[in-house]
Amino acid sequence: MNIENTLLKQDVWRFIDNTTINPAFDAIQSFATDDTLCRSVGARMAPSTVRGWVHEKTVSLGIQDSKLPDIDKGIAFLQKQGYRVVVRNSGGLAVVLDSGVLNLSMVLPDAERGIAIERGYETMFTLIKDMFVDCNEVIEAKEIEDSYCPGSYDLSIQGKKFAGISQRRMAKGVAVQIYLAIDGDQTTRSELIRDFYTISGKAKQTKYTFPDVNPNVMGSLSDLMKNDISLNGTLVRLFNSLRHYAGDLVSGTLTSEELDLFPAYYERLIARNDKVLT
C-alpha cells in the first residue's frame, strides 16, 4: 500500500451532498462549511468527510486577485456577465463555478501534523485517477502555466487542464479541494477569466504574477474523455471509489455541533468579502 492510499483508507467516510443548486446556499457558505469541517474533523468530533458542491455562475477569486490595480472594473465586468463574485479563503487565483463544475472537498484530521502538503495533493490525485480509471489517456498532475489558476497539481489530459487542486489548513484539519470541469464550455470559461484579468489591469502591475490565460490549454472531462460525463455519473464514480477505501460510507449533513460552529466562520468570510469587494 502506498502512502497516499493510507489516507484514503478510513474506518468511516462521511459524504455531504451540496450538489443541488440552491440560490440560498452560495459559495461563501461553501467555504465557511469547509472551515467548519476542518474544525470538527480536526477535533475528531466528526469522521473524515468528502463534500460535493456546485454553485451556478460564480467566480471565486483568490486573495492575490484582490490586489489587481483595477479590480473594481474587473468585478463589475464579471457581474455584468451575470456572475456572482466571491473571495475564497484557500490558495490560488480566479476560477469559474457553474452547473458543469463539480467541486469536491476532502477533509481529514491532522492532529499530529502528519499530512505534508504534497501528501494531501497526492491523495486527491489518487482518488481522481481511481474514479476515472476507465480513461484511455494518462491523467497527469503538472502545472499548466497558461490556464486559469495554475498550480503544480493541475490535472490534465494530453496537456489540457480539467481540474485544479488547492488546500485549506486550520484547526488541526486539512481540506483538500478540487474543481472538476465535468462538462460545459471550458473555452468560454477561460475567455471570461482572461478578459477579467485584462480589464482588472493585470498589465499595469509587476508585483504579482497572473496567468496569460489561453483557452486552448483547457477542456472539460466530457470533451477530453470523448464521453458524456455527467455530474451524477461522477458522483457514482466517487461513491464507488470511497466504498473501496472505507470501512463504512455514510451520507449525512452537518451535525448540531457543526451547525453551532458554522456562523462564526461564515461571518468571518462575509467580513473579508465586504472588505475586498466594496
UniProtKB/Swiss-Prot annotation:
Pathway as given in its UniProt record: Protein modification; protein lipoylation via exogenous pathway
Chain ranges of the BPL/LPL catalytic domain: 44-250
Record key words, sorted: Acyltransferase, Transferase
Active site: 149
GO biological process: lipoate biosynthetic process; protein modification process
Molecular functions (GO terms): lipoyl(octanoyl) transferase activity; lipoyltransferase activity
Catalytic activity annotation: N(6)-[(R)-lipoyl]-L-lysyl-[glycine-cleavage complex H protein] + L-lysyl-[lipoyl-carrier protein] = L-lysyl-[glycine-cleavage complex H protein] + N(6)-[(R)-lipoyl]-L-lysyl-[lipoyl-carrier protein]
Positions of the record's site feature: Lowers pKa of active site Cys: 161
Phenotype of gene-disrupted mutants: Strains lacking this gene are attenuated in their ability to grow in bile, but display no growth defect under normal physiological conditions. The reduced tolerance of the mutant strain to acidic bile salts is likely due to a decreased branched fatty acid content of the membrane phospholipids, which results when L.monocytogenes is deficient in lipoic acid.
Assigned EC number: 2.3.1.200
Domain of life: Bacteria
Known role: Catalyzes the amidotransfer (transamidation) of the lipoyl moiety from lipoyl-GcvH to the lipoyl domain of the E2 subunit of lipoate-dependent enzymes. Takes part in a pathway for scavenging of lipoic acid derived from eukaryotic host cells. Cannot use lipoyl-tripeptide (DK(L)A), lipoamide (LD), or free lipoate as substrate.
Extra facts: L.monocytogenes is a natural lipoic acid auxotroph and relies upon exogenous sources of lipoic acid for growth. Thus, this enzyme has not the same activity as its ortholog in B.subtilis which is involved in the lipoate biosynthesis pathway.
Protein family according to the UniProt entry: Belongs to the octanoyltransferase LipL family.
PANTHER family in the record: OCTANOYL-[GCVH]:PROTEIN N-OCTANOYLTRANSFERASE, OCTANOYLTRANSFERASE LIPM-RELATED
Protein name: Lipoyl-[GcvH]:protein N-lipoyltransferase
Native organism: Listeria monocytogenes serovar 1/2a (strain ATCC BAA-679 / EGD-e)
Lineage: Bacteria, Bacillati, Bacillota, Bacilli, Bacillales
